[in-house]
Amino acid sequence: MYIGDYLGRREIYSPDTLAIIDAGKAPELRLTFKQWNRRVNRLANWLSATAKVGFRDRVAILARDGIEHLDSFYACGKLGAIHTALNWRLHWREIVALIEDTQPKVLIYSDDFIDSVREIEKAI
C-alpha cells in the first residue's frame, strides 16, 4: 500500500469511523473516513483537471496548521505529486526563494496569506 491508497482503503473498511478532528476550526471540523476521502478526492481531481498537476509535479501549500495540509498531502499521494509545505512564519521574500528552488506547479494558500501571495506573485 502506498500513501495514495490509504484514505480509500480506510473508507472501504471503516467508512463511518471518525477519522479526524480539526479543533482549530470554528465550529470544530469532524470528518469520517468516507467524508475525508471524498474531500481529498475533490482536491486531487481539481489539482489534476484544473491545475494540470501530475506525477512528480510539486504542489506547495501556504497555510496555518490544519486539515488543509493533510488534504494536500493525501491528494498529492493520489496523484503521485510531491507535497511541498511552506512555513507560514517566513517572510514572503523567504518564501519566494523556496518557491524558486522547488518550482511548484501550483500554490495552495489560505486567505490569511493573500497579501503575501500578492507580493510573491509580483516577485516571481
Regions found by a protein language model. Give the residues of each.
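Helix N-cap/beta->alpha junction signal
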Residues: 40, 63-65, 110-111
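Generic structural signal for well-ordered alpha-helical scaffold segments
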Residues: 8-11, 41-49
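Structural motif detector for alpha-helix initiation sites
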Residues: 3, 32-33, 92
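Structural core segment of the AMP-binding/adenylate-forming
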Residues: 78-124
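AMP-dependent adenylate-forming
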Residues: 7-31
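Conserved AMP-binding/adenylate-forming
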Residues: 29, 46-90
